[in-house]
Amino acid sequence: MTRLFVLLCAALAVVLAGCATPEGPATRLDKANILPLELDDAYQFRKILTSVFDPNLDEQRVSGAKTGGVIDFERARRTWGAVDSLEVSKRHGSYFTLFWRTSKDSDVTLRLEYRQAGLGNFVMAQERYFPAARGSHRSTFQVTGDEFLENGLVSAWRALLIVDGRIVALRQSSMWR
C-alpha cells in the first residue's frame, strides 16, 4: 500500500511539473494596429507590477545609502545566472507583470503597447496569445537588451485584452495619451 502511494505521488509530481512550463518570449509587433474599444466586465486586469533594472539608476545611488531589501533582491533575481557583464547588460530594462482574469472561455490576446524615451511618440508593442483562456492568469513582458540600451526607459505603456479583434479590457499608465 505504501509503495502504491509513493508511485502515485511520483506520477502526480511528474504531471504537475509538466504543467509548470515557463512562458515563451512575447511576439514583437512591427506596427500596433488600432482596434475598436468594446469593454466587457467579463475581462479585467487585476494588478500590474512594473520594475526597472537600469545601470544608470544603479550608478546614481549614493554609496552607503539603504535601498531596502526588496530592491536589492529584485536586482539580484534579475542577474541570477549571468556570468559576465555582457549577460548582465542584456538583462537591463523594464519588466511588466500583468495579472488578469476572464470569466468566459475565449481566445484572448494580451498586448502591451509602450513608448520609450528615445523614440518619442512611436508606439512599440508585444503580444501573447492564450487559446481558450478562462480564469486568472499571470503574464510577463520585458523590454531589455539592445532595445532598452538604444531606446531608453519605457516612458508610457498600456495593456490590452483583445478578443475577436476588439479591446475588451484596458489599463494604462498615467503618462499614456
Where on the chain are the PLM-derived regions?
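Bacterial Sec signal peptide processing site at the extreme N-terminus
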Residues: 17-35
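Contiguous beta-strand segments within globular domains
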Residues: 64-102, 138-143
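Short proline/glycine- and polar residue-rich coil/turn motifs
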Residues: 129-137
